[in-house]
UniProtKB/Swiss-Prot annotation:
Domain of life: Bacteria
Any one GO CC term of the record: periplasmic space
Effect of D51N: Retains 5.1% of wild-type activity
Phylogenetic classification of the source organism: Bacteria, Pseudomonadati, Pseudomonadota, Gammaproteobacteria, Enterobacterales
Gene that this polypeptide is encoded by: pva
Signal peptide start and end residues: 1-29
Name of the molecule in the record: Penicillin V acylase
Functional description taken from the UniProt entry: Catalyzes the hydrolysis of penicillin V to 6-aminopenicillanate (6-APA). Shows high specificity towards penicillin V. Can use other beta-lactam substrates, including penicillin G, ampicillin, cephalexin, cloxacillin and dicloxacillin, but at a rate less than 10% of that of penicillin V. Does not show any activity with glyco- or tauro-conjugated bile salts.
Effect listed in the UniProt record for changing R244L: Retains 7.4% of wild-type activity
Record organism: Pectobacterium atrosepticum (strain SCRI 1043 / ATCC BAA-672)
Regulation: Exhibits uncharacteristic kinetic behavior, showing positive cooperativity coupled with substrate inhibition. Penicillin acylase activity is enhanced in the presence of the reducing agent DTT, indicating active sulfhydryl group in the enzyme. Also shows enhanced activity in presence of organic solvents and detergents. Inhibited largely in presence of Ag(+), Hg(2+) and Cd(2+) ions, which have strong affinities for sulfhydryl groups. Activity is also inhibited by bile salts.
MF-aspect GO terms: hydrolase activity
Amino acid sequence: MIKNNKRIKSTVCALSLVALTLGSAVSLACTRFVYLDPHNPDYPITARSMDWADDTETNLWIFPQELKRSGGAGQYSLEWTSKYGSVIASAFDGRKGMASTTDGVNEKGLAANVLWLAESEYPKTKPTAKKPGLSVAAWAQYVLDNFATVDEAVKSLQQEKFILVTKQVEGQKRLATLHLSLSDSSGDSAIIEYIDGKQVIHHSKNYQVMTNSPTFDQQLTLNAYWDQIGGNVMLPGTNRAADRFVRASFYVKNVNPNKLIPGVAEKGKIEKDKADLATAFSIIRNASVPYGYSLPDMPNIASTRWRTVVDHKSLQYFFESAVSPNIFWVDLKKINFAPRGGSAAKLDLGPNQSTIYSGQASGHFKPAQPFEFAGL
């Protein structure tokens, strides 16, 4: 199923959803958005935050072309060979059977992000030889390995060539339930969710923001309600996903760095690009949860551990840890993504992503064997 730019204007429905979301806890609080500066329209930027109660054990990886992959779904796993190289942020890659790709960008400028969605329900059909399985832990990587644009990825995903599978979160009585966002160098965007066992794709350049619960169609309803109020009058300010969605949506549409930096419009493309990067970082920080903040009765409201920003046109991947004084970045143009005989490269970020890097960090990656995706 695919939904394209459907506007929902029912205020009554929106008010009901506001009441519903105020009464529910968020399982995992992350935010993702695509910033499209109307004064710099050919320069899209994607930013995301990772909020989690414990150390996500995140590292950065360089994956080359022609890397053989298995989808982590047991006997009938989807198998493929990567067409494009990528730089990604992992989670739990030090734990056998737990690793995943949570965020990243490939050499063509396609970005992928997975965020928590408690309402996710994946197909109950078991993988077979004719229709193999793909673990949610490998979902983002599959897209980065195989596609150059959002449109190309969406057209392939619509064919449903695989069955998406999940497993219980280690030490918890719940399944890993995620949804996927995609964005590219044209500013195109897509949100892919599994609701009631069926794939739902929201594909439009207008779908710039994604958080967690509720489902994306309901987030659009909430946003329509707040649009009527107007962000200059009042914006919801809690750490809940619905509130972060509204705040991020307001700012990505209303910020104007040209007003803040004198003469930026006349200083040329480089200065405009710098201003847009600063804007993206400021918005994602606004949607972040302060480090060390938690609620005793709501353990799933968690601190922001790290943030990433993707410069799709310059092919730069920025990383900011909550416990490091520096932002650093990886310039994909400086990386040789040619096949490496099955090997990859890893940038060890240390416990709680506390290892300090500065500036362009591609030279600090060390050869490493790719991790295996968490699976059945």
